[in-house]
């Protein structure tokens, strides 16, 4: 299936786009085997200042640029004789008009998610079933910010030779996660008397995640550049910062088992045990064990 959504935001220069594509397939070659496959892709694009960045929106348009009513004139700017009460050069108090403020504080974010899962089930015997699952998740987040010559960022946080000149920053996050699980399940119904029912399952799961973070900053664009020009003609600026960080691989391995027992299909008992080992913890503390027991009675 496919769906697409476009939304025009209330704030000028801001809009939102989202598209989703998904596919699912189940196939049984014979009575003993089954194949399952599903995939999903989504892409979201948000333009304009109506969003927050990873730094807590510190570079967004100041609220004073929009809250003009809060700063409305509370008294006449004229004296009784009709002359100005204030110096004309200071009337605006350094504030930019809202349209300029929006255009000079422009953000563009593109998020992509890709998910793919596959499974194979094999009924080795009528009471013995094997299943393996494989999954892949890909996440990309590309955030770009343009600060024009009227912004605080351009006027105060740039190199001296690029003061009051437009700049851009870009943050890219890429994450890949691979998952695999294998389970073996046995049903003892044919072995035990009919008043008893017992099902055992054992399994193993592994998850590996890798992530990178890249940040760049380009200053010194010509003063007439807008966001679109700066994003597409980045060679006209001067790179002042470029960092790329590779996070340590995040790995987790799990072993688990479960037993389901019932007597007369009325008295129920379930016991599970799971052991998880994670690379996030130091050696000697990487393994955790999680047993549980549950009982039930059908009245």
Can you describe what each PLM-predicted range is?
Residues 2-8, 269-281, 299:
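Transmembrane beta-strand segments that form the barrel wall of outer-membrane beta-barrel proteins
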Residues 9-10, 14, 24-113, 133, ...:
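Surface-exposed loop/interface segments of Gram-negative outer-membrane beta-barrel transport/assembly proteins
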Residues 16-22, 254, 290:
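Transmembrane beta-barrel architecture of outer membranes
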Residues 23-27, 116-122, 182-186, 257-261, ...:
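Residues on the lipid-exposed face of transmembrane beta-strands in outer-membrane beta-barrel proteins
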Residues 138, 275-277, 289:
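Active-site-proximal loop/short-helix segments
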Residues 257-272:
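Short, contiguous hydrophobic alpha-helices characteristic of membrane insertion segments
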Residues 283-288:
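Short glycine/threonine-rich loop-to-helix capping motif typified by GTGT followed
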């Amino acid at each position: 299936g496919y769906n697409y959504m476009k939304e025009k935001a209330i704030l000028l220069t801001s809009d939102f786009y989202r598209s989703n594509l998904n596919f699912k397939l189940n196939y049984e070659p014979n009575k003993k085997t089954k194949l399952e496959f599903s995939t999903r892709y989504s892409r979201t694009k948000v333009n304009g200042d109506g969003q927050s960045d990873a730094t807590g929106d510190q570079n967004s348009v100041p609220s004073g640029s929009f809250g003009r009513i809060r700063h409305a004139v509370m008294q006449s700017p004229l004296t009784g004789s009709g002359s100005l009460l204030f110096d004309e050069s200071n009337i605006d108090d350094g504030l930019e008009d809202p349209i300029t403020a929006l255009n000079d504080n422009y953000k563009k974010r593109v998020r992509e998610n890709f998910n793919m899962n596959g499974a194979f089930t094999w009924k080795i015997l009528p009471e013995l079933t094997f299943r393996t699952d494989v999954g892949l998740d890909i996440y990309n987040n590309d955030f770009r910010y343009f600060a024009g010559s009227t912004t605080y960022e351009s006027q105060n946080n740039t190199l001296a030779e690029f003061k009051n000149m437009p700049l851009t920053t870009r943050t890219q996050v890429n994450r890949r996660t691979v998952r695999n699980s294998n389970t073996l399940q046995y049903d003892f119904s044919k072995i035990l008397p009919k008043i008893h029912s017992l099902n055992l399952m054992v399994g193993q799961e592994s998850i590996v995640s890798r992530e990178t973070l890249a940040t760049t900053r380009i200053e010194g664009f010509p003063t007439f550049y807008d966001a679109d020009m700066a994003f597409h003609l980045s060679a006209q600026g001067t790179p002042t910062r470029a960092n790329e960080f590779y996070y340590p691989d995040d790995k987790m391995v799990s072993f688990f088992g479960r037993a389901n027992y019932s007597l007369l299909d009325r008295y129920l008992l379930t016991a599970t045990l799971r052991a998880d080992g994670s690379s996030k913890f130091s050696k000697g503390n990487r393994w955790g064990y999680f047993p549980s027991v549950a009982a039930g009675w059908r009245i």
